[in-house]
Amino acid sequence: MANVVALYRYPVKGFAPEACETLFVLDEGRVAGDRVLGIRFADTEAADDAWSRKHGMVALINTPGLARLRVAFDAKGLRLRLSLGKSVLADEALNPEGRRRIGAVLADYVLKLDENPLTEHPERLPLRVVGDGRSPRYHDEESGRVTLHGRGSLRALEAALGMEVSELRFRSNVAVDGLSAWEEQNWVGRKIRIGMLEFAVVKPKTRCLATHANPTTGERDLPILTTLTQKMDQENPTFAVAMVPSGSGGEIHVGDHVALVE
């Protein structure tokens, strides 16, 4: 029997997750509170409330050291706190001045990293904190979608690498145990039920360089992409699947049963 064993959402695109006992899936197919904020380069032409590709933002793909920062987002009070270890770097309301201060603090942090997208591109400054804090919109793809992986696949990847791999590298919303390795990949084009909700599984999730970043140290320390293509014999490096609700959204919970809809 397969069950949900962990749920995550990511208030700020490309930053640390928030572990949850319950997620609310909107009718549109996104998780409430997920990717509601982003840190965008000054020279990115997209409007603040519009979707854009992650290459126009500070994100793990270009700044692996972001993984060291911890995020606490007060969705009701619209307040964001960023910390590094025991040090609070910023604790600001999402008003214009608070956004400016968060952007400045993050720019200072990022510029001190050995690998960063700002030192050679001053035109990307100042950093802009975008998003209203309520609408989930800064996903890898404009369509959003809920993502799910099986821990059986994670264990297979660990065996190929010969070491433990944190599932946080893959930034899924839903982690499931009780599946065989890569079983979830066979769900593409089919429907599953999680608790009381039914989902259509629409595609496998192609991975990027962000998965190489250690979620604790912020170092690129594992060759995830080449392991998936060379040792797992994948044409494209994929891990997890993307899905949308069939019909209306609703809540999913840790402990919910997961099964194919026959």
Region locations from a protein language model:
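Metal-cofactor-dependent catalytic cores
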Residues: 1-262
